[in-house]
Amino acid sequence: MTHYDVVVLGAGPGGYVAAIRAAQLGLSTAIVEPKYWGGVCLNVGCIPSKALLRNAELVHIFTKDAKAFGISGEVTFDYGIAYDRSRKVAEGRVAGVHFLMKKNKITEIHGYGTFADANTLLVDLNDGGTESVTFDNAIIATGSSTRLVPGTSLSANVVTYEEQILSRELPKSIIIAGAGAIGMEFGYVLKNYGVDVTIVEFLPRALPNEDADVSKEIEKQFKKLGVTILTATKVESIADGGSQVTVTVTKDGVAQELKAEKVLQAIGFAPNVEGYGLDKAGVALTDRKAIGVDDYMRTNVGHIYAIGDVNGLLQLAHVAEAQGVVAAETIAGAETLTLGDHRMLPRATFCQPNVASFGLTEQQARNEGYDVVVAKFPFTANAKAHGVGDPSGFVKLVADAKHGELLGGHLVGHDVAELLPELTLAQRWDLTASELARNVHTHPTMSEALQECFHGLVGHMINF
C-alpha cells in the first residue's frame, strides 16, 4: 500500500491539471484513470470535435463561398480523412498528458478507483489485480455522462457524442435531440458533409441558455445552412427499427413522427457520482445529484475535494481546469484565487459562426434588478469580418448603468470565442466601460467590435 499527499480520481482536464499543480507545489501525487487520459475532452470531445469543425468550415467555404473566393473546379470531400485527422489530433494531445505526468513526477495508476474509506482508494487495475492507495487529500474529478431523453435508451443507431465522434462513416440523415452546444456543433459538421440534419429542442429556442438575440441569430444562420431546428418540441419516444429510427415528437399538443438513419442524444450531462464509493468516504451530494463543494472545491469531508463536471457548477473543461488549480493550491496551503460567480466564466459553441458568452443575459440582468445599459455592434460594420468573408453576427454587451461595469457579453461571429478573455478579465477586475473604451485595439481585427461596444456603453460608438 502506497501513501500520497494527494490522489486525484479521474484524469480529465480538471484532474490532470490539479495533479500537475499539486506536484508543482511539492506534494507527492498520484492520479487514477481507467480509460481516457485527458478525459472526454481530449479523447472524444472538445479536441477532436474542433478538428472536425475546422474541416467542416473548409467544406463550407468550398461549397458555399467558392465563387466569392475565386475558387472553381471539382472538389471532393472525404469525411473519413477528416475523421482520421481528428483522431491524430486527439492522440497527440493525450500523449502530451502522459508526458506532463512524467515531467512532474506524478504516479499514473491505470484502473478504476473507488473509495474504501475517507483515506483509502481501492483501484481495480486495467491489467488485472487491485491496488490500495492511501492519501492525506483526494480530488474527485470523475466527470459526467450523457443524460438520455426520459424513457429512451441507446442502441446501434441511437447514440451519444462518443459513438458519433468515433464513427468514420456518416449517416444520410440524423435527428439530434438537444440544441445545446453539442447538438449545434455536430449539426454544423454533419450538415456541411451532406447529412440531412434535424435538431429537436424542448425549450423555445436553440442554445436556450444564451441571450435571446444570440439564439435568434444562430437559428437564422443554421436555416441558411439548411438545418431544420424544431423548438418548443418534446421528444416522446425513440424507436430504432434497424435501417431507420422513428422519433415521435409533440409540439403544442400535436404529435409528429420524424424518421432518420440515426439519432444523437445531446440533451445534457449528469455528474458521475455512482460507483465510486462516495458513501464510504462520507461525501455528500446536492439535491441535483452533484457533489457539493465550497468556493475552494472542498466537499463536506474537509480533505476531499471535487472539481469539474461532477460538482455541477458549470460543466466546461476550462472551468474544471481552473477549479483544479484552486483545489491543489488550497491543499498545499498556497495563495489561491477562488472563481467567484460561475455565471461570469466564459462559455462557447464552436460552429461557424461561433457563439461565445459570459455573465448575465440582458433579460437576466433586468430580472435581477440592475439598471441596464446595452450596446450592440454588428460585424457587418467590422472591416476584418468582411476580409475574412464572414460578417455575420454581432457583439452585445450588457452593463450596469450606475457603475459602468460589465454584467455580460454575448457574441456571434467568426471565431469570436477568441475574444472572450478580454471581457472576462474586465469583469473580474471591475473595469468600467469608460476605462475599457480607452484601450487601443489593433486594426483591423474582430476585437474592434468590442471597442465599439465599450464606446457604445458610454454613449458614443464611432463606426456604427
Swiss-Prot record:
Top-rank lineage group of the source organism: Bacteria
Gene null: resulting phenotype: Cells lacking this gene grow, albeit poorly, in standard medium with dextrose, glycerol, and fatty acids as carbon sources, but fail to grow on carbohydrates. They are less resistant than wild-type to exposition to mildly acidified nitrite, but are more resistant to oxidative stress in the form of H(2)O(2) in vitro. Lpd-deficient strains are severely attenuated in wild-type and immunodeficient mice. In contrast to wild-type or DlaT lacking strains, strains lacking Lpd are unable to grow on leucine or isoleucine.
GO biological process: 2-oxoglutarate metabolic process; cell redox homeostasis; pyruvate metabolic process
Impact reported for H386K: Reduces lipoamide dehydrogenase activity by 91%
Binding site for FAD: E33, P34, K35, Y36, W37, G38, G39, V40, C41, K50, G113, D309, A317
Residue pairs linked by disulfide bridges in the UniProt entry: C41-C46
Compartmental location: Cytoplasm
GO molecular function: antioxidant activity; dihydrolipoyl dehydrogenase (NADH) activity; disulfide oxidoreductase activity; flavin adenine dinucleotide binding; NADH binding; oxidoreductase activity, acting on NAD(P)H, quinone or similar compound as acceptor; zymogen binding
Result when mutating F464A: Reduces lipoamide dehydrogenase activity by 95%
Outcome of swapping N43A: Reduces lipoamide dehydrogenase activity by 89%
Record has Oxidoreductase as a keyword: yes
Effect of pH on activity: Optimum pH is 8.0 for PDH complex activity. Half-maximal activity is observed at pH 7.0 and pH 9.0. Activity is abolished at pH < 5.
Cofactor note: Binds 1 FAD per subunit.
Gene3D superfamilies given in the database record: 3.30.390.30, FAD/NAD(P)-binding domain
EC numbers, comma separated: 1.8.1.4
Signal sequence coordinates: none
Catalyzed reaction equations: N(6)-[(R)-dihydrolipoyl]-L-lysyl-[protein] + NAD(+) = N(6)-[(R)-lipoyl]-L-lysyl-[protein] + NADH + H(+)
Protein family: Belongs to the class-I pyridine nucleotide-disulfide oxidoreductase family.
Biological role stated in the UniProt entry: Lipoamide dehydrogenase is an essential component of the alpha-ketoacid dehydrogenase complexes, namely the pyruvate dehydrogenase (PDH) complex, the branched-chain alpha-ketoacid dehydrogenase (BCKADH) complex, and likely also the 2-oxoglutarate dehydrogenase (ODH) complex. Catalyzes the reoxidation of dihydrolipoyl groups which are covalently attached to the lipoate acyltransferase components (E2) of the complexes. Is also able to catalyze the transhydrogenation of NADH and thio-NAD(+) in the absence of D,L-lipoamide, and the NADH-dependent reduction of quinones in vitro. Together with AhpC, AhpD and DlaT, Lpd constitutes an NADH-dependent peroxidase active against hydrogen and alkyl peroxides as well as serving as a peroxynitrite reductase, thus protecting the bacterium against reactive nitrogen intermediates and oxidative stress generated by the host immune system.
NCBIfam families linked to this entry: lipoamide_DH
Additional comment: The active site is a redox-active disulfide bond.
Subunit structure: Homodimer. Identified in a complex with AhpC, AhpD and DlaT. Also is part of the PDH complex, consisting of multiple copies of AceE (E1), DlaT (E2) and Lpd (E3), and of the BCKADH complex, consisting of multiple copies of BkdA/BkdB (E1), BkdC (E2) and Lpd (E3).
Protein name, entry field: Dihydrolipoyl dehydrogenase
Taxonomic lineage from the root: Bacteria, Bacillati, Actinomycetota, Actinomycetes, Mycobacteriales
